[in-house]
Amino acid sequence: MIRLLNCKWNELNEKLTNKKLYCFGSGSQAEWLSYEICQVHLAEKISAFIDNNFNKQGTFVELDGIKIPVISFNNFVKQRNNGTVILITSMYYSDMLEQMDREPLLDGVECYIEVFLEEPIEKAYFNVAHNEVEKIPKKIHYCWFGKQDIPQQYLEYLKSWERFCPDYEIIRWDENNYDYDKVSYTSQAYRAGKWAFVSDYARLDIIYTYGGIYLDVDVEVVRNLDPLLKNQMFCGFEKGNLINTGLGFGAEKGFGLLRDMREMYKNVLFINSDGTLNLTPCTKFQTDFLESRGLKRNGKQQLIDGIRVYPRTVLAPYDFFQVSNQFSDMTFTAHHYAATWFGRKNNKRSLVQKNHEIIQRMREK
């Protein structure tokens, strides 16, 4: 079996001294990780990316100006030696572990999984001056498209909004009061039954038009949100140093940069020309947009043209994979990641169980 290990991101480079690193997975997860890989100077230590997708084999991944080849799993097995280390850079890490465990030539090879690498809790700062004007109105908006009942678990999260923010107006948006045909992207997503993608645009449009705070229904509020209202706009990092407005974000009515973020979707179609669905997550659009305005994907608090970007601990202490916890005295909301876009045959409960088994293997070393 593979030898599973874990460490902090900033310790990984040191552990690779005199070793050759192979990254398993060259897809979107690896693309999003490019910033972290370059930050800790790992690019020059990567011998190759491994990918099971035949169409990617023989291509290259460019990181920090270095072109890194993509090879097949079988070629990797032939290349491996006593100094080989694997870093799984895919959200399908469980399947990849099973594949490697079945290969006897990989017995004892050191392996790390990116989503399990530990990250420090970054400090957050809030304007607590009593004379500071609250720019964002006391409104909490949420979307529920699809005409189905809201599951009981989510209703419990909604109760937390009322408990900690009793003087806020809570507004539901659905087919009855929101025009999902406003842009082609949402119109196509709605007819494809992809409600989460409808919300990706709708929440930007709603907050720009009315002002307030948006929360996904799988977000639990853990303290009063008033300190966040003193921003013109706020949003937050999630694991991987990506921006996700589904975690919870807010803005004053008519905020200019939010309008620009919304307008991006007018040039995007949900159904591609070949009939396939454009499942690019909102994190890609929103992170790219803010990077073009000067965002640094370092997980630290920053102010970009009136947008306050908070570290992960503020709005997303948990991650989708439920393998890390950055809950702190700076946490306002906790996103529990229903991830309805995650169309896999294995449900999330099964994934969480596998994660616990992986953590146990790491502890056993």
Predicted regions and their residues:
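Glycosyltransferase-associated regions of secretory-pathway enzymes
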Residues: 2-20, 31-32, 36, 41, ...
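Short glycine-aspartate micro-motif
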Residues: 23, 214
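Short amphipathic alpha-helix with an adjacent loop that forms part of the alpha/beta core around
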Residues: 71-82, 184
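Glycine-rich Rossmann-fold phosphate-binding loop(s) that bind the pyrophosphate
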Residues: 26
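Active-site region of the double-stranded beta-helix
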Residues: 49
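Short, conserved SAM-binding/catalytic segment
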Residues: 61-66
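Small-residue hinge/turn detector
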Residues: 200-212
